[in-house]
């Protein structure tokens, strides 16, 4: 699944987590790890605007040959992160960044994949689900992801969609939507 996020070199080991709560990275509270990277005190990550900024720096967790996104949706008072999807202990996680261009490229890649799966049939409806962080990244270019999809599928195909708190893709076997 195309997601538009790229690793920037920082790698961490998830040393303590439980379901959707990411407690520690490399043995330190998750907010302390982000504080060291971005230069703001760890206690400030629990409050706006930094609590919102954390969403723009998700973690990529290896699954097969790709990185799946795990985004902090809330920074807790104890310095842990409430994530958009479960994170397992012991996995390696990579700090990710995105940009308008990478989001547009990912949208075009996803549209191209969808078109290939239609095997020559013309799409009658496009349903777009994008991570809420894209809305934050594209705030100065609203609709950029829609235009990118229309560049591939055409402007005459009706569109519907919305923002999600994670990657939702068609299942490989059944085609049933699944949260990665």
Task: Please annotate each region the language model reported.
Residues 1-139, 143-157, 162-180:
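Small-residue-enriched flexible segments
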């Amino acid at each position: 699944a195309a997601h538009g996020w790229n690793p920037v070199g920082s790698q961490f080991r998830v040393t303590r987590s439980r379901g959707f709560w990411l407690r520690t990275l490399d043995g330190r509270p998750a907010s302390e790890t982000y504080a060291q990277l971005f230069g703001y005190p760890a206690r400030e990550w629990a409050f706006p605007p930094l609590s919102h900024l954390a969403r723009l720096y998700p973690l990529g967790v290896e699954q097969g040959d790709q990185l799946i996104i795990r985004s902090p949706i809330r920074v807790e008072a104890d310095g842990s992160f409430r994530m958009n999807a479960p994170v397992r202990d012991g996995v390696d996680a990579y700090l990710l960044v995105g940009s308008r261009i990478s989001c547009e490229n990912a949208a075009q890649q996803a549209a191209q994949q969808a078109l290939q799966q239609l095997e020559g049939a013309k799409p009658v409806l496009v349903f777009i689900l994008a991570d809420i962080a894209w809305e934050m990244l594209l705030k100065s270019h609203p609709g950029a992801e829609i235009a990118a999809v229309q560049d591939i599928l055409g402007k005459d195909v009706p569109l519907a969609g919305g923002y999600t708190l994670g990657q939702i893709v068609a299942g490989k076997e059944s085609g049933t939507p699944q949260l990665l």
